[in-house]
From Swiss-Prot:
This is Protogenin. Glycans are attached at residues 82, 163, 235, 305, 465, 480, 622, 725, 746, 758. Its main location: membrane. Residues 963-1187 are cytoplasmic. Keywords: Developmental protein, Disulfide bond, Glycoprotein, Immunoglobulin domain, Membrane, Repeat, Signal, Transmembrane, Transmembrane helix. The gene is PRTG.
């Protein structure tokens, strides 16, 4: 910017020539500050200099202001020749003698004045310690932490002493934070002693009380300890360029690793950030972009076991301009507009100065947000204007010059202006033409505004030059208005006419008062009301009319009260009855509109211990929100358990009850409609009964968009996004609509569980950001969220609802029922049950196992299994070792605690070979480490006894069978039925067996496969000497038995081909209970008859089988498992190496039952069998499954 001494002559010559026809325009050499005062902190009796140097056209006068008032200079305080303020000795006494305060310098020349930024002068102080270090007891190897806090200006430097000597900080395990925290990691015995902190400032030094550190010897056993953050980060608010420390101290075994991240997933600034000690985050030269939520995470190495702590860093920034006002040149009666935009944290407040003095809005000068508009410019408006933005962090100013151009040919002002009231909303305004240059007038401008109050808006109406009167008919009743007239010509406008004030007439009230109803006893109602706002009163209220009646009675009683009253007590009413009340107000003109009926129930006559009605007060906050406040009567002795709040729009259904605590005295009702009347009732209750209720009505004001119908409501926020952060918090993010460039936008977030019944649980949160972390939610619960915005007194509709569910809680307990079973020489099976608790969600299990030697070294082997599995294999175990096993459950939130350690002894090979398998060493959930898993003497004795009993039973059965077979050799052959023992192997039901007994007379109950069978025309010799088969045609020659591999046949197909007859032949293989051969024939079989074979099912011997541990499942009592047992089941074929020796007569119906009961899943698993079959006999092979 050029200085006045360099450009004065040139500017005067050029502008003098250019503006020769326009007298009144001068050269303006800009006035500005070279140096401005800064914030200063000084000690008492110190000398202080506050700089202030201005440049511009001389002469420049500099004066100083303190807290807005002029500084009185004396020998101690005076202005230097360069404009700076000098204070020889700073005084710090309380009251007027103190020099502390905000200082500004004002520079003035003939074109105007400018004001500097504020300078805050403070005295250096230090207070007593707010937090003293406390004695503590720490185990050797643990973490010790001391803290102290003291308020000082400037901030004190904190150091530490141990046993009254300076604590050396050269060791890596000792960290002293600038915030006054001392951390000692890996505590040793030599660290024991007395600690204290020392706070030092430029003026003084203070020492805290001493705290003792006692060190306890560490135990040899160091059990696993889940990570815990014992000192997490705290919310911090810092100014720009300061240094911030976020503390994080964690314990655990093994030692946890501490890491830092941001909740918004932005990267942490590595250039200004470093880690102090073992995990404290230090951010130097803080900037606005550093603000956010920082997350400290402590993790056990090699596991997913972690815990987190969060803190919010808020960075405050002084104001800075993003738009500056520009100098303007305007003619008289023109309009000047200055724009100014500033940003900062918190949002700065904008104000305007004219020649260093604050401007207030009036009729001509208006301030819209951050804009300054000057209408009907007059010569006095020629000045320097400054935009000042200020917040708690400081102030900044920007300047602009308004130059008013004058014209000599302008007309004189209209005169003899007078006004006459026409009605409650109209005034007639008349005037006379200007005395000078009236023939050049082309139009008149009528200006009017309310005479009372501040910041009233001025209205303007332009009319032609052919009239000298005008009726303004949009005025408010019973109000004073001020008017003036301006005449216009092509080259400019006249001066303003004289001002005239006139009063409009009264009118009937536009609205009824808001009433409140309470009861002091069961037989009365106290009616109270608030005065009608002047906007709706339209005059002075002289009368009130109260109307009331029973809700069941149509008779209305009316009372008239003077306009000065504000309450009335109705007495002699019925207890426990609903009364309807309404009120009307009147001015001298007449009665206004009555309110709607308001209901109130009188208390019960027996309500002697019921709480009295609270004193209720309603206040609208904005067009959609009201605040409900109440106060309980101090003389009320009844117990109060809580409050019930109800509200409704007139003519609509009531909402509530909203249940509130007894300590609550305020509640905010949101989501209402503008310009609506609402009825609110509140009552206290206890465990005996409900108390007396208080009723009151309130009207919500109109929103700008509703009142004018010209500005539509803003659109709601878009792209609302929700993401579960923890089990108790959900992160919300949404987009800002592109409809406006407004800097200040506030948002309301509505949050409630899905299907909520109690309206008091609806949560409304406020923020100015486009994101929020909603905390304090219930785990594993679905919530619905909606957002609306507020800008310039406008509120948008609610955004579309978004649903999201919080994460489940991390498992609180370990898996239960942990068992370990040795199933191979080097393989063990571990099984468990999920943690207790129906709400526990498990997505993964972590199995840690190690031998004793590895455990001592801290080396664990890790296995992971999905949450649906409750078994796993431990492979490659070394014989002769004892293994320790423990299990933990985890989900996406975190990992739960580990179970108690379970031991498994893997015996040496020579020991395991001497004991025949299977031997399973089952291990239960145990806290003792010495429980070895082997078969004791009692178990071996039980096994031997059981085997002996089984062998004895088998021997007895064989003897009985031999005895019965000999007894039947002499008897005539009879058809017999298979024994119930045989039927048990072929899955023949008892019901089917009973039917056979009824149809066949004389069937032996326990016939075995060694007995001969005769039926009709066939006889089979089963004595063992021959395999000859004789039928009605004679002996049947049996060819050599051939092995054939057969597949299962369809059961349905077999049934359709099976002849319907009563008896069939059945030839059994040598192995009872394994394969049944049934010969079916209505007539003797011919040699060429084709055989039909069907092999339903067969089970192999029970063998040990173990699938991959990745697919393990709990099988219940046996402990064996198989994830794919259906696919891997191996069935062995049953073959006969000897000729068929026996035959049975079996009922045809029984054979069908055999088929139905034994053929299962044959379509899914066709199995191949080798059978010995005679070439000429049609046989069907039935395999029975033993359960």
């Amino acid at each position: 910017m050029p200085a006045a001494s360099r450009c004065m002559a040139l500017l005067r010559a050029l502008l003098g020539a250019l503006l020769l026809p326009m007298p009144g325009v001068w050269c303006f050499s800009e006035l500005f500050f070279v140096r401005e005062p800064q914030d200063v902190t000084a000690s008492r009796k110190d000398a202080v200099v506050l700089d202030c140097q201005a440049r511009g056209e001389a002469p420049i006068t500099v004066t100083w202001l303190k807290n807005g008032g002029k500084v009185s200079e004396n020998e101690r305080i005076y202005t230097l020749s360069n404009g700076s303020l000098y204070i020889s000795e700073v005084e710090g006494r309380k009251g007027e003698q103190s020099d502390e305060g905000f200082y500004q310098c004002l520079a003035l020349n003939k074109y105007g004045a400018i004001l500097s930024q504020k300078s805050h002068l403070t005295l250096a102080t230090i207070s007593a310690f707010e937090v003293q270090p406390l004695s503590t007891e720490v185990q050797e190897g643990g973490v010790a932490r001391f803290t102290c806090k003291i308020a000082a200006n400037p901030p004190a430097v904190v150091t530490w002493e141990v046993n009254r000597t300076t604590l050396p900080l050269s060791m890596d395990r000792i960290t002293a934070l600038p915030t006054g925290v001392l951390q000692i990691y890996g505590v040793e015995q030599k660290d024991a002693g007395n600690y204290r902190c020392v706070a030092t400032t430029i003026t003084s030094r203070r020492k805290s009380a001493e705290a003792t550190l006692n060190v306890i010897p560490a135990s040899d056993l160091k059990p696993f300890h889940k990570p815990a953050i014992i000192a997490g980060p705290q919310n911090v608010t810092a100014s720009l360029h300061q240094t911030v420390i976020l503390e994080c101290v964690a314990t655990g075994n093994p030692k946890p690793i501490i890491s830092w991240s941001r909740l918004d997933h932005k990267s942490i600034d590595v250039f200004n950030t470093r880690v102090l000690g073992n995990g404290n985050l230090m951010i130097s030269d803080v900037k606005v972009q550093h603000a956010g939520v920082y997350v400290c995470r402590a993790t056990i190495p090699g596991t997913r076991n972690f815990t987190v702590a969060m803190a919010t860093l808020t960075v405050l920034a002084p104001p800075s301009f993003v738009e500056w006002p520009e100098s303007l040149t305007r003619p008289r009666a023109g309009t000047a507009r200055f724009a100014c935009q500033a940003e900062g944290i918190p949002a700065p407040k904008i104000s305007w100065l004219k020649n260093g003095r604050r401007i207030h809005s009036n009729g001509r000068i208006k301030m819209y947000n951050s804009k300054l508009v000057i209408n009907q410019i007059i010569p006095e408006d020629d000045a320097i204007y400054q935009c000042m933005a200020e917040n708690s962090q400081g102030s900044v100013l920007s300047r602009a010059r308004l130059t008013v151009v004058m014209s000599e040919d302008r007309p004189s002002a209209p005169y003899n202006v007078h006004a006459e009231t026409m009605s409650s909303s109209a005034i007639l305004l008349a005037w006379e033409r200007p005395l000078y240059n009236s023939d050049k007038v082309i139009a008149y401008s009528v200006h009017y505004m309310k005479a009372e109050g501040l910041n009233n808006e001025e209205y303007q109406v332009v009319i032609g030059n052919d009239t000298t009167h005008y009726i303004i008919d949009d005025l408010e009743p019973a109000s004073n208005y001020t008017f003036y007239i301006v005449a216009y010509m092509p080259l400019g406008a006249s001066q303003m006419s004289d001002h005239v004030t006139q009063h409009t007439l009264e009118d009937v009230p536009l609205r009824a008062p808001e009433i409140s109803l309470t009861s002091r006893s069961p037989t009365d109602i106290l009616i109270s009301w608030l005065p009608i706002p002047a906007k709706y009163r339209r005059g002075q209220v002289v009368l009130y009319r109260l109307s009331f009646r029973l809700s069941t009675d149509s008779k209305i009683q009316v009372l008239e009260l003077p306009g000065t009253s504000d309450e009335y007590l109705l007495e002699g009413l019925r207890p426990d009855s609903v009364y309807l009340v309404r009120i009307t107000a009147a001015t001298r003109i007449g009665w206004g509109e009555a309110s709607l009926w308001t209901s109130h129930r009188t208390p019960k006559a027996t309500s002697v211990k019921a709480p009295k009605s609270p004193e209720l007060r309603l206040e609208p906050i904005n067009c959609t929100t009201i605040t409900v406040q109440w106060q309980q009567d101090s003389d009320d002795t009844a117990a109060i358990q809580g409050y019930k709040l109800y509200y409704k729009e007139e003519g609509q259904q009531e909402n509530g009850p909203i249940l509130l605590d007894a300590s609550d005295l305020e509640y905010t009702v949101s989501g209402l409609d503008p310009r609506r009347k609402y009825h609110v009732r509140l009552l206290a209750y206890n465990n005996m009964e409900e108390g007396y209720q208080a009723d009151q009505t309130v009207s919500t004001p109109g929103c700008v968009s509703v009142r004018d119908r010209m500005v539509p409501p803003p659109p709601p926020p878009h792209h609302l996004y929700a993401k579960a952060n923890t089990s108790s918090s959900i992160y919300l993010h949404w987009g800002k609509p592109a409809f406006t460039s407004a800097q200040v936008i506030n948002y309301t977030i509505r949050c409630n569980p899905v299907g909520l019944q109690n309206a008091s649980l609806v949560l409304y949160l406020q923020t100015s950001e486009t994101h929020m972390l909603v905390q304090g939610l219930e785990p594993k619960t679905m919530y619905e969220f909606a957002v609306r915005l507020h800008v310039d007194q406008l509120s948008s509709p609610w955004s579309p609802v978004v649903y999201h569910t919080t994460l489940p809680e991390a498992p609180s307990g370990p898996p239960v029922g942990v068992k370990v079973t040795l199933i191979e020489d080097d393989t063990a099976l571990v099984s468990w049950k999920p943690p207790d608790g129906p709400e526990t969600v498990v997505t993964r299990y972590t199995i840690l196992y190690a031998s004793r030697k590895s455990w001592i070294a801290g080396e664990w082997q890790v296995l992971h299994r999905e949450g649906a599995m409750t078994m796993a294999l431990l492979e490659n175990l070394v014989a002769g070792n004892v293994y320790l096993v423990k299990i933990a459950a985890s989900n996406e939130v975190g990992e739960g605690p580990f179970s108690n350690v379970v031991e498994l002894a893997v015996l040496p090979k020579e020991t395991s070979e001497s004991n025949q398998r299977p031997k399973r060493l089952d291990s239960g959930d145990s806290t003792a480490y010495s429980d070895y898993y082997h078969l004791d003497q009692k178990s071996m004795t039980g096994i031997v006894v059981g085997v002996c009993i089984a062998l004895t039973c088998i021997l007895i059965c064989i003897l009985i069978l031999i005895y019965r077979s000999k007894a039947r050799k002499t008897s005539a052959p009879k058809p017999v039925q298979q024994s119930t023992d045989q039927l048990s192997h072929t899955n023949i039901s008892l019901a089917s067996a009973n039917e056979v007994e009824k149809s066949i007379d004389g069937i032996a109950e326990n016939a075995e496969s060694l007995l001969p069978m005769i039926v009709g025309n066939s006889f089979i010799d089963a004595k063992g000497g021959s395999d000859l088969i004789i039928n009605s045609y004679g002996p049947v020659t049996k060819a050599n038995c051939k092995k054939r591999w057969l597949f299962f046949q369809d059961t349905k197909k077999m049934k359709t081909e099976e002849p319907q007859r009563r008896f069939v032949q059945a030839v059994c293989l040598y192995q009872p209970g394994t394969t049944v051969l049934i010969s079916e024939d209505d007539s003797p079989s011919s040699p060429g008859q084709q055989s039909n074979f069907q092999v339903p099912f067969s089970i192999a011997a029970d063998t040990e089988h173990s699938a991959n541990s990745e697919g393990s499942h709990e099988t219940g009592d046996s402990g064996r498992f198989s994830h794919e047992s259906n696919d891997e089941l191996h069935l062995s074929s049953v073959t006969s190496a000897t000729p068929c020796a026996t035959s049975h007569f079996v009922s045809s119906d029984l054979g069908k039952n055999v088929m139905n009961s034994t053929i299962s899943d044959s379509k899914e698993s066709p199995l191949l069998f080798a059978t010995d079959q005679p070439a000429t006999s049609p046989l069907q092979i039935h395999s029975a499954v033993q359960n």
